[in-house]
Curated annotation (Swiss-Prot):
InterPro entries: Mur-like_cat_sf (IPR036565), Mur_ligase_C (IPR004101), Mur_ligase_C_dom_sf (IPR036615), Mur_ligase_cen (IPR013221), Mur_ligase_N (IPR000713), MurCDEF_pg_biosynth (IPR050061), UDP-N-AcMur_Ala_ligase_MurC (IPR005758). Belongs to the MurCDEF family. Its EC number is 6.3.2.8. Keywords: ATP-binding, Cell cycle, Cell division, Cell shape, Cell wall biogenesis/degradation, Cytoplasm, Ligase, Nucleotide-binding, Peptidoglycan synthesis. GO terms for cellular component: cytoplasm. The keyword Cell cycle applies. It catalyses: UDP-N-acetyl-alpha-D-muramate + L-alanine + ATP = UDP-N-acetyl-alpha-D-muramoyl-L-alanine + ADP + phosphate + H(+). GO terms for molecular function: ATP binding; UDP-N-acetylmuramate-L-alanine ligase activity. It comes from Cereibacter sphaeroides (strain ATCC 17023 / DSM 158 / JCM 6121 / CCUG 31486 / LMG 2827 / NBRC 12203 / NCIMB 8253 / ATH 2.4.1.) (Rhodobacter sphaeroides). SUPFAM superfamilies: MurCD N-terminal domain (SSF51984), MurD-like peptide ligases, catalytic domain (SSF53623), MurD-like peptide ligases, peptide-binding domain (SSF53244). The keyword Phosphoprotein does not apply. ATP binds at G118, T119, H120, G121, K122, T123, T124. This is UDP-N-acetylmuramate--L-alanine ligase. Its main location: cytoplasm.
Length: 470
């Protein structure tokens, strides 16, 4: 048996169907670090698969039955459906087929675990918790939903007792994870295609929190009404709350922004009157990011970290890929790439942009899924108020069929109808470049938002602007 995981020390090759996915790749990387043989397939190679190959994995481009080879176990995500040739071959052979969350739970089983859940902010909060535990000497294992800049990866295998994981609520699998400390950042009606109703999602988060052991801890943001309601329903478990509100156990006070850096103090109200961490700074703007940091502070204090350690760790926070990531600056115009694709996320990111620059904010959004745009259409029409200019690209379908009334031009019309002064459609990457050349001036910020191919547009934009300007 492997002492770190309870898994047998030799399983034979573990095959991941969709190994390039951000959730799958982290598990694969940690398994390799523990000495297991890993192989996997994906539709195409990527930086993620290249990294896994450099660590010793075998990668197959494209998915076909023959890729399994001598695989002894097959790991799949919820995105892999019946009919996938590798899944069908595994079942034909009678191989164990393991869901991603089940394999993650196996890795967690012999560690003390911190699991971070919430509709928004999971990845950044996971990174912040990992950053603080690193500074505190805990040497944690980390499996995240985004690439942590300090690691150059979304995963890290540490030798310490603690494991920090992002807990994905999208398919309900987060309730399989054996969390010792459970963090809830917020709860919004998302992923209804799985949950069916908001009440079912609420129950999922209730189960996530109440599944912790009696010696565990729930860390919950009571600035969010749904999370505060959840706290009121939970009994017989220890809870620490965080937020900006006066009742929060871990509370941000005296917040101000200077040159895109958040400066604040943290009142540790659960530790008694007068307990404050003064002079905190976070090198990224946004009230939502300060809130995420409070969750990490709550965990760090629970685990015994000193105030100075916490202050120093957050001040050096390196961030996470595609979360308000600066990809370039051309002619005094800052270009940001962000994963935000839900109205709540978009509004928070644009508010952060407004706090970070003195010039104008130009938002470029690629809606992700027709179903999301359709179900949250009115929210999308009002979440861009902090942007001076809004450009909407074609919907990234993610395999969905178009829905009447939920397309690019519908959203542009909706923005204008709701009072936005400058909203327009863009057709392609060339169109984005033309827009920026036409609209952006020194001191402005261009924020590219979305979960699809918009990230490539953002990353290409600085070179395109410099190339044609030369």
């Amino acid at each position: 048996m492997n002492a770190a995981t309870k898994l047998p020390g030799e399983l034979g090759p573990i095959h991941f169907v969709g190994i390039g996915g951000i959730g799958m790749s982290g598990i694969a990387e940690v398994l390799m670090t523990l000495g297991y043989r890993v192989q996997g397939s994906d539709a195409k190679a990527s930086k993620i698969t290249e990294r896994l190959v450099s660590l010793g994995a075998t990668f197959f481009e494209g998915q076909r039955a023959g890729n399994l080879g001598e695989a002894a176990v097959v790991v799949i995500s919820s995105a892999i459906k019946k009919g996938n040739p590798e899944l069908e071959e595994a079942r034909l052979r009678g191989l164990p087929v393991v869901r991603r969350a089940e394999m993650l739970a196996e890795l967690m089983r012999m560690r003390s675990n911190i699991a971070i859940a919430g509709t928004h902010g999971k990845t950044t909060t996971t990174t912040m918790v990992a950053t603080l535990l690193d500074k505190g000497g805990f040497d944690p294992t980390v499996i995240n939903g985004g690439v942590i800049h300090a690691y150059g990866s979304n995963a890290r295998a540490g030798a310490g007792e603690w494991m920090v994981v992002e807990a994905d609520e999208s398919d309900g699998s987060f309730n399989r994870l054996p969390a010792t400390i459970a963090i809830v950042t917020n709860i919004d009606p998302e992923h209804m295609e799985h949950w069916g109703s908001f009440d079912a999602l609420r129950k999922g988060f209730y189960d996530f929190v109440t599944n912790i052991p009696f010696y565990g801890l729930a860390v919950c943001c009571t600035d969010h009404a749904e999370v505060q309601a959840l706290v009121g329903r939970v009994t017989d478990r220890r809870i620490v709350t965080f937020g900006f509100n006066a009742q929060a156990d871990v509370r941000a006070i005296n917040l101000r922004y200077e040159n895109g850096i958040a400066h604040f103090d943290v009142a540790l109200q659960s530790e008694g009157t007068g307990h404050v961490i003064e002079g905190m700074s976070l090198p990224m703007p946004g009230d939502h990011n300060v809130s995420n940091a409070l969750a990490a502070v709550a965990v760090a204090r629970h685990l015994g970290m000193k105030k100075d350690e916490i202050r120093e760790a957050l001040a050096a926070f390196g961030g996470v890929n595609r979360r308000f990531t600066k990809v370039g600056e051309v002619g005094g115009v800052t270009i940001i790439d962000d994963y935000g694709h839900h109205p709540v996320e978009i509004a928070a990111v644009l508010k952060a942009a407004r706090q970070a620059v003195k010039g104008r904010v130009i938002a470029v959004h690629q809606p992700h899924r027709y179903s999301r745009l359709h179900s949250l259409f009115d929210d999308f029409c009002t979440c861009f108020n902090e942007a001076d200019v809004v450009a909407i690209a074609e919907v990234y379908a993610a395999g969905e069929d178009p829905i009447p009334g939920a397309g690019r031009d519908d959203l542009v019309a909706g923005l204008i109808a709701h009072g936005h002064r400058h909203a327009r459609a863009i057709l392609c990457e060339d169109d984005l470049e033309r827009l920026v050349r036409e609209q952006a001036r020194p001191g402005d910020m261009v924020v590219c938002l979305g979960a699809g191919t918009i990230s490539a547009w953002a990353n290409n934009l600085p070179a395109r602007l410099m190339g044609k300007a030369a």
